[in-house]
Amino acid sequence: MVEWIEIQYPIEYSEAYKMMKSRLTGILNGTASEAVFILEHQDVYTAGISAKNDELLNCYDIPVHHTDRGGKFTYHGPGQIIIYPVINLAANGRVKDIRNYVNNLASLVINSLKFFNIIGITVQDTIGVWIDSEFGRKKIASIGVRIHKWITYHGVAINVCPDLKKFKGIIPCGDRDTIVTSINELLDQKIDLDYYKAILKQEFYKIF
């Protein structure tokens, strides 16, 4: 079974990246098992390999990290749950198909949102999970991955209760029309992060 590793405090992006890469190397050389890291980050803007400089509007003294994942700019911070699976798509009956893997990550989020009667959707020609509300379409989760020798790293970020104002420092995912939301904003109440993490763990093992 894939090892589930939960970090109990917001960590720097660079620390999480080192953990992912170390686990990936261990899987490749046979010294480590597959793992999922679930955590929150300290405030950071991350830029994927497709990010453009003019998509960073105002960093608000928030650190900026350029990464090797797919995608453009996004924000990570406390109140946003991050899932970083480091798993082998060539093993355990999985499919060596990146699009299928990204779709499975979206399904994980969509299934978890059902516990709160929130209907998550995917949108053609975009990556991530969205919701349709009376105020229009809003993004609730971002997905950005990289695959090395069919081993995955990076992953998905789900807005539970982050400071949504901090998304205004970037053009999220390169789309000026993107409006972000969170579970707490949609419910107009706080949910317990540990409860939500337990849901994600349950739903992850159903898919992967």
From Swiss-Prot:
Family, as annotated: Belongs to the LipB family.
Other remarks on this protein: In the reaction, the free carboxyl group of octanoic acid is attached via an amide linkage to the epsilon-amino group of a specific lysine residue of lipoyl domains of lipoate-dependent enzymes.
One Gene Ontology MF term: lipoyl(octanoyl) transferase activity
Keyword Plastid attached: no
Cellular component terms per the entry's GO annotation: cytoplasm
Compartments, record wording: Cytoplasm
EC number(s) per entry: 2.3.1.181
Protein name according to UniProt: Octanoyltransferase
A Pfam short name: LplA-B_cat
Organism of provenance: Orientia tsutsugamushi (strain Boryong)
Active-site residues per Swiss-Prot or TrEMBL entry: 173
Gene name per UniProt: lipB
Keywords: Acyltransferase, Cytoplasm, Transferase
Gene3D superfamilies: Bira Bifunctional Protein, Domain 2
Taxonomy of the source species: Bacteria, Pseudomonadati, Pseudomonadota, Alphaproteobacteria, Rickettsiales
Role summary: Catalyzes the transfer of endogenously produced octanoic acid from octanoyl-acyl-carrier-protein onto the lipoyl domains of lipoate-dependent enzymes. Lipoyl-ACP can also act as a substrate although octanoyl-ACP is likely to be the physiological substrate.
BPL/LPL catalytic domain: residues covered: 30-208
Keyword Transmembrane helix included in the entry's annotation: no
Residues the record lists as binding substrate: 69-76, 142-144, 155-157
Reaction(s) the record says it catalyses: octanoyl-[ACP] + L-lysyl-[protein] = N(6)-octanoyl-L-lysyl-[protein] + holo-[ACP] + H(+)
